[in-house]
């Protein structure tokens, strides 16, 4: 099946409820807590996005990489067998947006390698042909633009971003 990822827009009340819940691991409460919230769903492409921005898998991110944090969240709330939760507080979103918007897309394109993506098994069990490299990169850039747009909306609304990756 694989793991899917999305970015949920969460208000202060809901995030505080989630963080204060100590009865069970956060992942046990995540679906109930996030039910009905607006979100950007990027399905199984979340690791493609991470790879396209950083050159590494989200399963093995470079320490203190600001582009990795733009995808995974500024703060790791839970990282385990059931999934991953990351949080970017509203006051951190402007810097995250600036970081993503300031990227040189041409430089990212030069660094992008479908051969490396296949070697790292970013999408396990699938080998992508080199003919798809441009199309795959364009898809990653589209997801990045959608993420920037979602982050802008969250910033305007005074909400926070919760990165959710579940299996």
From Swiss-Prot:
Organism: Escherichia coli (strain K12)
Summary of subunit composition and partner proteins: Monomer.
Gene3D superfamilies attached to this UniProt entry: YfbM-like super family
Pfam families registered for this protein in UniProt: DUF1877
Protein name stated in the entry: Protein YfbM
InterPro entries: DUF1877, YfbM-like_sf
